[in-house]
Amino acid sequence: EKTEQNILQGIDFVKRSKGRWLLGNIYPYVEELTRKLQDSSLIQRAVAAGSIRRMKETVGDVDILVTTSKPEKAIEYFLSLVSYEKIWGKGVTYVSVHTNEGFDVDLRVLPEEVFGAGLQYFTGSKEHNVRLRAYAVRKGYTLNEYGLFKGKKRIACKTEKEVYEALGCSYIEPELREDQGEIEKSIAGKLPSVIPYGSLRGDLQIQTDWTD
């Protein structure tokens, strides 16, 4: 019975993960790419966003945000680092490629002064962002990748913490931004603590043939 349940759960996982990559397989690639971007004199900051930053078990594509005073040169440098089959789109502050490894990588250039707002916008799941923007509207604001606005006046943009707190929320860790009640809990001051990666010391469960 337990084996049957495990098989059914595995089938469900495969269906949900179709067209996606296991985090453990794609993370080293992203880590190396962001390090090379960060090491360039062209780029001030390079951070992976999206499901990579949320540490989802599977990843559909890769989003990387950078700040630079030379967007076009930074984009060309990025293209020199990746092996790609196709460029899906390219602009002054954006490029999207399909890599030879089989997944898409999007690079977005953001102004330094709004990097926090952009990082918040491109990190959360679609559902988290929709709910947060709707909450902002109810409070009389507009929220996008360039900041939190009251009419035409920008209220918050420099850091993610600043954006959340301006909305009356406590800071929500990236791993929690899945629209599973985290916004409501942050407003109420009841967000659960996230175990820091440095606190992990080993595997707490070992599977054997006897567990089936």
For each feature predicted by the language model, list its residue ranges.
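Short acidic, glycine/serine/threonine-rich loops at helix termini
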Residues: 6, 58-60, 120
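Short hydrophobic beta-strand that contains or immediately precedes a catalytic carboxylate
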Residues: 48, 203-206
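Acidic, metal-coordinating catalytic segment for phosphate/diphosphate chemistry
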Residues: 19, 72-201, 208
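Helical scaffold of the NTase/Pol beta-like nucleotidyltransferase catalytic core
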Residues: 1-47
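Histidine-centered divalent metal-coordination motifs
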Residues: 63-65, 205-209
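Active-site nucleotide-donor binding segment shared across nucleotidyl transfer reactions
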Residues: 31-71
